[in-house]
């Protein structure tokens, strides 16, 4: 038995077309799909008809509210009624995010300064989940997620600042609508309340371009390692800062850390003290002046090279006490220091601070001796004479050490 034909009058059909024309057009946004479909369903429910001609007239009015790209993608020439078009719109333009992910996004709604902005953002995220559940039409899933939304309201309230939470915790809040109503009654819906926290200072990255705009410059997020002096224990030389008032900290070590033998370096007398040493720094003159340049100095072999053997100094052994007066014999009647003695004293005091290495005479054992006549001396006689000179030099040194007195110069100024 066929159903009776229900047809609309011309006035009702024109009214239905006018109301469908006033609906906001759908341009493919998934967030507005549920609103568009619900309004069309409302108009169709008011003007129901099973006449094929009138259904196509109403379908044409609905198609005028769709974007041209949507009509081409859906293939509307093959669609004859609204239920078929509705199913294709839902399958093509609904939100593709899973329902559990939408519920998680609702629970993670951020607080941005005011309770009103917080409630509006939470309501927008809730509507995305609710609209998708309505479009899918699964009643069991709808009930489960509605219960999850009610439980999420308590989680959102706990994330609010303490000033707002202490006021809202005394009320039984089950949905966002009741939260907004209670906040308006308490007078905190429009107030701007922020969290109390301290921001870390931002440091400008050294590698950033100086000509770049200050608003677009990047900042180094690794604040802990920025501008920290990097040094290791005796691995690299001391690198001072370009600012003389800001020097990087370097600890003082009184003992050598490694087992490797220390390497000798030429002393730098112009640098400041880098390490705190409890013992006094003694300036030793490693290169002594030979009183008689005609003597050939005794040498010591070291790794195939020859170096002059250092002679024992004829002054005080303890260099902590500088020379104040030149030694004289006990029978000397001189009471004033001569000019030679003053120069002798100044020379020794200067050598304690800055020894003159470049004035040192150096002779190799195998080098030609300019102070000796080689015209009538062969190699054997030269070796014998060299041994005699060394013995005589050692004898003079021993006598000088036993006497501890120096001979007064003959030509002195009184």
Swiss-Prot record:
Residue ranges with Polar residues bias: 221-235
Region Disordered: start-end pairs: 204-235
Name of the protein described by the UniProt record: Retrovirus-related Gag polyprotein from transposon 297
Predominant location: virion
Keywords: Transposable element, Virion
Cellular location(s): Virion
Superkingdom of source: Eukaryota
Compositionally biased residues, Low complexity: 206-220
């Amino acid at each position: 038995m066929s159903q009776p034909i229900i047809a609309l009058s011309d006035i009702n059909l024109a009214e239905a077309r006018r109301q469908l024309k006033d609906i906001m057009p759908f341009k493919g946004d998934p967030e507005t799909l549920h609103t568009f479909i619900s309004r069309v369903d409302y108009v169709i429910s008011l003007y129901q008809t099973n006449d094929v001609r009138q259904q196509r007239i109403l379908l044409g009015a609905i198609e005028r509210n769709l974007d041209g790209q949507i009509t081409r993608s859906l293939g509307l020439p093959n669609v004859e009624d609204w239920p078929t078009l509705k199913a294709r719109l839902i399958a093509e333009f609904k939100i593709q995010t899973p329902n559990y992910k939408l519920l998680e996004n609702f629970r993670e709604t951020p607080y941005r300064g005011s309770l009103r902005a917080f409630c509006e953002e939470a309501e927008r995220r809730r509507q995305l989940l609710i609209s998708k559940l309505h479009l899918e039409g699964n009643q069991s899933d709808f009930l489960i997620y509605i219960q999850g939304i009610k439980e999420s309201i308590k989680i959102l309230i706990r994330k609010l600042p303490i000033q707002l939470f202490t006021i809202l915790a005394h009320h039984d809040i089950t949905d966002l609508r009741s939260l907004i109503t209670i906040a308006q009654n308490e007078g905190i819906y429009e107030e701007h309340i922020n969290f109390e926290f301290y921001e870390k200072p931002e440091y400008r990255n050294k590698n950033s371009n100086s000509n770049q705009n200050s608003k677009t410059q990047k900042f180094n997020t690794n604040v802990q390692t920025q501008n920290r002096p990097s040094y290791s224990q005796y691995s690299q030389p001391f690198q001072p800062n370009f600012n003389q008032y800001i020097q990087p900290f370097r600890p003082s070590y009184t003992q050598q850390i490694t087992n490797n033998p220390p390497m000798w370096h030429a002393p730098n007398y112009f640098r400041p003290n880098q390490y705190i040493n409890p013992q006094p720094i003694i300036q030793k003159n490693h290169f002594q002046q030979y009183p008689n340049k005609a003597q050939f100095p005794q040498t010591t072999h070291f790794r195939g090279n020859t170096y002059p053997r250092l002679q024992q100094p004829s002054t005080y052994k303890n260099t902590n006490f500088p020379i104040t007066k030149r030694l004289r014999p006990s029978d000397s009647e001189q009471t004033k220091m001569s000019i030679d003695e003053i120069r002798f004293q100044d020379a020794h005091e200067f050598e304690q601070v800055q020894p003159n290495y470049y004035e040192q005479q150096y002779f190799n054992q195998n080098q030609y001796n300019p102070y000796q006549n080689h015209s009538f001396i062969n190699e054997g006689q030269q070796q014998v004479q060299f041994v005699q000179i060394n013995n005589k030099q050692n004898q003079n040194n021993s006598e000088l050490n036993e006497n501890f007195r120096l001979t007064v110069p003959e030509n002195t100024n009184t």
